[in-house]
Amino acid sequence: MNKILIAAASSGTGKTTITLGIMHALKKRGLRVQPFKVGPDYIDTNYHQAITGVASINLDSFLIDDDAMLATLFQKHGESADISVIEGVMGLFDGLGIDRDNSSTSFIAKCTKTPVILVVDGKAISTSAAAIVDGFNRFDPELTIAGVIINRVASENHFSLIKGAIERYTDVPVLGYLPKNAAVALPERHLGLVPKEEMTELETKWELLGDLIAEHVDLDRLLAISKTGAKLTVHPPEIQVPDFSGVRVAYALDAAFHFYYQDNLDFIRSTGATLIPFSPLEEREVPDADFIYIGGGFPEVFAEQLAKNKSMRESILAAHEQGKPIYAECGGLMYLGSSLEMEAESYEMVGVFDGVSKMTTRLRKFGYCIAEPLEDTLLGKKGTAIRGHEFHHSVFETTEPTRMKLTKKRDGKIVKEWHGGYQKGNTFASYLHIHFYQNLLIITHMFGAIER
């Protein structure tokens, strides 16, 4: 199994840009590329899929606290590809707290036995780049940097300086560089990169990026490195897949709602259930289904269009009033509230919950947490520990009672506690994003609410 992992010294170094360029260049060579993303991010994975034509898979060692399960999922998705390309998150050793193996890119590299390519920012640096590479290469005796790519290089002369320094003072090969070019920069907004659903002329950007990588990076050497990763010996955990044949699951999928982990959707299908996508933006009513799943996204960007689609809002509210189970995450919670406010405007939403979503100028919640239902809910029974991730620039102001206690820990200590999650009838919504493979009984529990 050929595999590489693209890591960096820190966020903002150009890791995503380099990764996308490599994926495009390899695909242009006729290779089937299986993309992966370390961590819980949804937007990078959308970009990966746009370029490779293959669904990108999240590898998150906090959301899935089971090394064997992570390795199994990696092997399962990568075994039919010509090469697996993993994009890291933050800096190589950054994770939860100061433990270099706690939810970090380096841990995923070791768990999957994947060679690491380090992206180094070349802006305003020369010989000091060698110190960065040397430090990263020595930091963890169990991990070796297999190659380096330099980003934001001013000229061939500049690249020669950096390459010469790294290869003189370390034994890590420099595979090439990406020159400074504003045309390949990726636009950002409050949740990170702007999703592909909202960007035009993407193909032109990808084409240019892929051509630059093909011109300035030694892809043959990179492919040779991808063959050096140790063979992954997988011991798949025993999985009891429940039988939900005949169950119809309608899930919101459009430019406003598209934050889903591919493995979550795949697992639902593996139970025999049928997934039916629908658009709260474009369609008049929710499809005939036994269960409704509304993931996260950017409802605030499309608030006016969502508000104008009154028939869809009424359709979802009617499904709730009929007792149909509805599960919603983050943007889905905002949609199920009574209204969404932004820039002095108020937009009517579905109205399952009596609450107002208000956009904020700063990040309100960010990071991993463990949720514990305070009573039996659609998400889980009272006291069940559920791992999740929150990341939002909004607050949900409501008098509805909260149904979960959420705890954020760092290095074994509780650093924050709060309450969230709302249940009314058979509808549950919260800001929490979860991965079903942490505990496959989550789906068994949620689908157990379906009248069959």
From Swiss-Prot:
Similarity-based family: Belongs to the CobB/CbiA family.
Reactions this protein catalyses: cob(II)yrinate + 2 L-glutamine + 2 ATP + 2 H2O = cob(II)yrinate a,c diamide + 2 L-glutamate + 2 ADP + 2 phosphate + 2 H(+)
Organism of this sequence: Listeria monocytogenes serotype 4b (strain F2365)
PROSITE patterns assigned to the protein according to its UniProt record, in alphabetical order: GATASE_COBBQ (PS51274)
UniProt xrefs under InterPro entries: CbiA/CobB_synth, Class_I_gatase-like, CobQ/CobB/MinD/ParA_Nub-bd_dom, GATase_3, P-loop_NTPase
GO molecular function annotations of the record: ATP binding; cobyrinic acid a,c-diamide synthase activity
Function field: Catalyzes the ATP-dependent amidation of the two carboxylate groups at positions a and c of cobyrinate, using either L-glutamine or ammonia as the nitrogen source.
Note: The a and c carboxylates of cobyrinate are activated for nucleophilic attack via formation of a phosphorylated intermediate by ATP. CbiA catalyzes first the amidation of the c-carboxylate, and then that of the a-carboxylate.
Active site: 330 (nucleophile)
Site feature (Increases nucleophilicity of active site Cys) residues: 433
Name the UniProt record assigns to this protein: Cobyrinate a,c-diamide synthase
Residues covered by the GATase cobBQ-type domain: 248-441
Cofactor(s) listed: Mg(2+)
EC number of the protein: 6.3.5.11
PANTHER family (UniProt xref): COBYRINATE A,C-DIAMIDE SYNTHASE
Record comment regarding domains: Comprises of two domains. The C-terminal domain contains the binding site for glutamine and catalyzes the hydrolysis of this substrate to glutamate and ammonia. The N-terminal domain is anticipated to bind ATP and cobyrinate and catalyzes the ultimate synthesis of the diamide product. The ammonia produced via the glutaminase domain is probably translocated to the adjacent domain via a molecular tunnel, where it reacts with an activated intermediate.
Keyword Magnesium: yes
Keyword terms: ATP-binding, Cobalamin biosynthesis, Glutamine amidotransferase, Ligase, Magnesium, Nucleotide-binding
Pathway where it operates: Cofactor biosynthesis; adenosylcobalamin biosynthesis; cob(II)yrinate a,c-diamide from sirohydrochlorin (anaerobic route): step 10/10
GO biological process: cobalamin biosynthetic process
CDD domains xref list: CobB_N, GATase1_CobB
